[in-house]
Amino acid sequence: MRIDGREKDQLRTVKITTNYIKHAEGSVLIEMGDTRVVCTATVEDKVPPFAKGEGKGWITAEYGMLPRSTETRNVREATKGRQSGRTLEIQRLIGRALRGVVDLKALGERTLWIDCDVIQADGGTRTAAITGSFVALALALNKLVEEGILPVIPLKDFVAAVSVGIVDGEEILDLNFEEDSKALVDMNVVMTGSNRFVEVQGTGEEATFSMEELQRLLTLAQKGIRELIELQKQALGDIARRIGMENAADSNSQ
């Protein structure tokens, strides 16, 4: 039994609240245990300079933590005048995860800005941000369809993320902060609804891990991600059934 009473292969309690922010085209509050992240998606009718004239869109992400999202106050990065390496890494991870399931050509020359703000942190903030951001992105893209700007939602698949690790010799799913702090192996896994990997980040902390342990951790992550994608579908309701339709239409026309 784990610190919080969960089984080894059990996610924390997950809640996804849609349309959490009034002004954003898409927004959610995702809660995974005591970790809470606000994710918004904003549509901008232009692309970065490097993408101009390419006939396709772009997805970019920003990530930050409120000063008292943690046990002791963190100084805002804006006050420091620079973003940390950790923040930059997480922003890139979120962007890559989402671009992996978006048909950028079908999106057209527009940018979707994804903003992830951690309001309370208890481990797994980057994975929660990815899972929540996908829902916010889907809501924003659906709005473009409803407004007649896009014919279909340009999402090829679902995507979600979860952490796995080895703590006290046990392979466990969805680590909280206390578990993460003493994990011998810590891994973040990003996967699609069709069981394809977008990213795997795995590190041994003063330890190594075997191929067999890696395989078991990936299988554990796959189980958690399947459950998270089901929760994404529940949060999106009817919109969920229209995700991947463009791929289906392409297959039928071949």
From Swiss-Prot:
CDD domains: RNase_PH_bact. GO terms for molecular function: 3'-5'-RNA exonuclease activity; tRNA binding; tRNA nucleotidyltransferase activity. Keywords: Nucleotidyltransferase, RNA-binding, rRNA processing, Transferase, tRNA processing, tRNA-binding. GO terms for biological process: rRNA catabolic process; rRNA processing; tRNA processing. Its EC number is 2.7.7.56. It catalyses: tRNA(n+1) + phosphate = tRNA(n) + a ribonucleoside 5'-diphosphate. SUPFAM superfamilies: Ribonuclease PH domain 2-like (SSF55666), Ribosomal protein S5 domain 2-like (SSF54211). Phosphate binds at R86, G124, T125, R126. Gene3D superfamilies: GHMP Kinase, N-terminal domain. InterPro entries: ExoRNase_PH_dom1, ExoRNase_PH_dom2, ExoRNase_PH_dom2_sf, PNPase/RNase_PH_dom_sf, Ribosomal_Su5_D2-typ_SF, RNase_PH, RNase_PH_bac-type, RNase_PH_CS. Homohexameric ring arranged as a trimer of dimers. PANTHER family: EXOSOME COMPLEX COMPONENT, EXOSOME COMPLEX COMPONENT RRP41. Belongs to the RNase PH family. Phosphorolytic 3'-5' exoribonuclease that plays an important role in tRNA 3'-end maturation. Removes nucleotide residues following the 3'-CCA terminus of tRNAs; can also add nucleotides to the ends of RNA molecules by using nucleoside diphosphates as substrates, but this may not be physiologically important. Probably plays a role in initiation of 16S rRNA degradation (leading to ribosome degradation) during starvation. NCBIfam families: RNasePH. This is Ribonuclease PH. It comes from Carboxydothermus hydrogenoformans (strain ATCC BAA-161 / DSM 6008 / Z-2901).
